[in-house]
Amino acid sequence: MKRHVIYIPGLGDRSDPLRRLGLLLWRRPGVAVTFVPMRWLDPKETYEEKVVRIQSALLKYEDRNVTLVGESAGGAVAIACYERFRSRVSGAVTVCGMNQGAGAVNPVLYKKNLAFRDAMLAVDKALPNLSSQDRATMLTIYSSNDGVIGKKETVLKGVRSIDIKVPLHMLAIGYVLFLKSSLVTKNI
């Protein structure tokens, strides 16, 4: 059975070409990857428009063997969409994800990006609705040396976690994207 990954990037749309390049390494027999751009830099695009793009990607797959993978700010989107579309999604993985704690984010960042604020509010609302069975199909990959997102915001109760210990947020994401994709593809 083919496994499908829908990759949801974090802030920093200018890095999307690099992300797409890294995702080429994720493709292997039995694994298909779809990159869904978030367009975080578009101040007019709402969180809901981002969710609609993810929903459209989900509708392309007949089976339920789809895992949402969210990176950084995309972690919040992946978890909120997992809760919202549980009937079409088999699991969620976050890579250095901002997975909870809307109040922990600097208000200046929200002022620049209302869609990110709405994603954080959505994930905080979604988390209590996830059962222990739902959480058993989730994985958080984080770095205790991230420097941007703390363990408190990324590690979720009842969800398996892997600490990659790579220094710096972007370096840790790049490590998973280019060198350790197996952390995701072997755990979905």
Regions found by a protein language model. Name each.
Residues 22-42:
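Conserved alpha/beta-hydrolase
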Residues 21-27, 152-157:
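Short, aromatic/basic amphipathic alpha-helical patches
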Residues 44, 102-108, 169-177:
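Short, charged, surface-exposed secondary-structure boundary motifs
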Residues 1-3:
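Proline/glycine-enriched tight loop/beta-turn segments at coil->beta junctions
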Residues 8-11, 143:
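Glycine-rich His-Gly loop
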Residues 133-188:
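C-terminal catalytic-base region of ester-bond hydrolases, centering on the histidine
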Residues 5-8, 16, 32-35, 49-137, ...:
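Serine-dependent carboxylesterase/thioesterase catalytic core
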Residues 14-21:
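The serine-hydrolase catalytic nucleophile loop
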